[in-house]
Amino acid sequence: MAVASTFIPGLNPQNPHYIPGYTGHCPLLRFSVGQTYGQVTGQLLRGPPGLAWPPVHRTLLPPIRPPRSPEVPRESLPVRRGQERLSSSMIPGYTGFVPRAQFIFAKNCSQVWAEALSDFTHLHEKQGSEELPKEAKGRKDTEKDQVPEPEGQLEEPTLEVVEQASPYSMDDRDPRKFFMSGFTGYVPCARFLFGSSFPVLTNQALQEFGQKHSPGSAQDPKHLPPLPRTYPQNLGLLPNYGGYVPGYKFQFGHTFGHLTHDALGLSTFQKQLLA
């Protein structure tokens, strides 16, 4: 029975042998001939006469057991502090990843990174407090209850959060009535303004837009200047004019000036009748 315990797990101790196709090592197999693979491996595994094989003190292939990883208690896990590598010392041109920076617009690099890191740290601390086990929370609460409060402790003043008004609703004299450079939204009446910085242009456009849509604008409308015309309707064109003249194709028998004058003076319906 002691010899049978040394066989490889999975082999029959009564009749151990390998099946054809086994690619592992079988000792002394290369020196055995004249029998089938199963018979030869069976004799070698049981041990030839006068040779104790396999040795009693060890097995051919001991079972392999993966090492157990040490269990680390949840409370002793190290706190993740990867975001501390990002600080205010970053300069414009930094191409690394800054968490939550892709959701902030219309600010310079320093302001975007500072606000993104602040939001990420606040969110990370909030998630970490929610993941604490109830026992740890209970111990933390009891420790807080046991700590005596110092006398005369001043309460921290609460900062009132003032919502920033929209530039559309601001007064025209408000210096904040503009959009910052980098704003990609639509700004009414800013299409035909140029020659100044983006904040100045958006301020002028917002003022013009507010004047057009103010309640008193309908009573005192501003007349737009007449649109320029490509062709004069009361004069003809000079000879050698190489541009297109609508209706000239069907005119003949007069000079170029008379023909173009007649063609340009006709209405669209009259030109269709001539065609």
UniProtKB/Swiss-Prot annotation:
<feature type="compositionally biased region" description="Basic and acidic residues">
    <location>
        <begin position="71"/>
        <end position="84"/>
    </location>
</feature>
<feature type="compositionally biased region" description="Basic and acidic residues">
    <location>
        <begin position="125"/>
        <end position="147"/>
    </location>
</feature>
<keyword id="KW-0206">Cytoskeleton</keyword>
<comment type="similarity">
    <text>Belongs to the CIMIP2 family.</text>
</comment>
<feature type="region of interest" description="Disordered">
    <location>
        <begin position="62"/>
        <end position="84"/>
    </location>
</feature>
<dbReference type="GO" id="GO:0005879">
    <property type="term" value="C:axonemal microtubule"/>
</dbReference>
<dbReference type="GO" id="GO:0031514">
    <property type="term" value="C:motile cilium"/>
</dbReference>
<keyword id="KW-0969">Cilium</keyword>
<keyword id="KW-0963">Cytoplasm</keyword>
<comment type="function">
    <text>Microtubule inner protein (MIP) part of the dynein-decorated doublet microtubules (DMTs) in cilia axoneme, which is required for motile cilia beating.</text>
</comment>
<feature type="region of interest" description="Disordered">
    <location>
        <begin position="125"/>
        <end position="169"/>
    </location>
</feature>
<dbReference type="Pfam" id="PF10629">
    <property type="entry name" value="CMI2B-like"/>
</dbReference>
<dbReference type="InterPro" id="IPR018902">
    <property type="entry name" value="CMI2A-C-like_dom"/>
</dbReference>
<comment type="subunit">
    <text>Microtubule inner protein component of sperm flagellar doublet microtubules.</text>
</comment>
<keyword id="KW-0282">Flagellum</keyword>
<keyword id="KW-0966">Cell projection</keyword>
<protein>
    <recommendedName>
        <fullName>Ciliary microtubule inner protein 2B</fullName>
    </recommendedName>
</protein>
